[in-house]
Design a protein with these regions (language model features):
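Non-globular, low-confidence helical/coil segments that flank catalytic cores
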Residues: 1-217
Length: 217
């Protein structure tokens, strides 16, 4: 991989940003996309130290993404559904939410957005949230992945990023039940390891690396 068009950091939690500096050092990044969010008195923004300086020094453009913006990406486009919110009740609900489309392929990523943010997305976009592949909200937490939201997304497949025997019980059985309710195939990093999804001839295929399951995040 010679370079990245975009490095998207959904929200300032270490499990979503921890290796951002390593990526910026290892690869040329054209654009760093960040959400709009300011910490309240009860929360802190856990961005990697000197992230902005490192991005600027590497030549990356730093953008605060806003809902409604679209960015070209290969033969497709990256649409910003939620660009974060200064009024969000939590940093999770301020997560950058994106929909990548290319032909008939649609990939939805909502970061750690929880039920309130999911409902706002349903109210705003309705059935146009439909995705071929959905990255499970908040690692498959019960606070996300509501049935109402999953019925709007109607994914062909769900990718759950979670560690083996993690302390949070991800993915939660309620989330798994909601995925099953809408007929989605579920792939989990704690069981299958690294997941590589390939869209070819209108068919979604996945390659796994089971030996990496113990290290999945």
């Amino acid at each position: 991989m010679p370079s990245l068009d975009y490095l998207v950091l959904t929200h300032p939690h270490a499990d979503h940003t921890g290796n951002a500096r390593a990526v910026l050092r290892a690869l040329p990044v054209k654009t760093l996309l960040l959400p709009l969010w300011q910490p309240t008195a009860d929360e802190t923004a856990d961005w990697p130290r000197h992230l902005a300086e490192l991005a600027a020094d590497s030549g990356a453009e730093i953008l605060t993404a806003e809902a409604g913006e679209e960015f070209p990406l290969g033969s497709g486009k990256l649409q910003i559904l939620q660009g974060g919110s200064e009024d969000a009740d939590s940093v999770n609900d301020a997560s950058l939410c994106t929909l990548f489309t290319a032909g008939d392929f649609r990939f939805l990523d909502t970061g750690d957005a929880e039920a309130d943010a999911e409902q706002r997305l349903v109210d705003t976009y309705g059935p146009t949230l439909h995705a071929t592949l959905f990255k499970a909200g908040h690692h498959g937490s019960y606070t996300s992945n509501s049935l109402t939201f999953m019925q709007a997304v109607r994914p062909e497949a769900v990718a759950v990023s979670c560690g083996l025997h993690n302390d949070y019980g991800h993915p939660h059985r309620a989330a798994l039940q909601n995925y099953a309710e809408v007929g989605a195939e579920v792939w989990r990093t704690d069981l299958e390891g690294s997941l590589t999804f390939i869209w070819q001839n209108n068919t979604l295929n996945v390659e796994t690396s089971a030996d990496s399951a113990d290290f999945a995040a």
